[in-house]
Amino acid sequence: MILYHGSNLFIEQVDLQKCRPFKDFGRGFYCTEIKEQAEQMAKRVAYIYGGSPCVTICELNEEAFVSPEMNIKTFRKYSHEWAMFVLNNRNRDFTEFNRVDCNHDNKYDIVPAQLPMMI
């Protein structure tokens, strides 16, 4: 599976410590299957933080989605569960990390959803 990441710099290796916290699916490396979406994000990030728009192309082995070693949280549609997950991840005061409806602690390796995918 080919994925795209829009930023203001080329990403050689994912480093979660460089990823911003309190995003929809938690701190992570957000990607999309839609190249144009990544291009728009790259322009936005470059406008906000400076630099030049850059789209990093990533390849994800689809076997990762069925690997028992991966902890995956899937949202098949927008729902109350999805909304609470996003709300809790955006909440800087949220501290109940053991709950399944948050990813502050990066318990989920992949969160595929209708929005950009976090890996």
PLM features: residue spans?
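Glycine-rich loop/turn
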Residues: 1-29, 36-47
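Conserved NAD+-utilizing ADP-ribose enzyme module
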Residues: 23-24, 40, 44-54, 59-119
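Ordered hydrophobic segments in well-structured contexts
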Residues: 1-5, 29-31, 54-57, 109
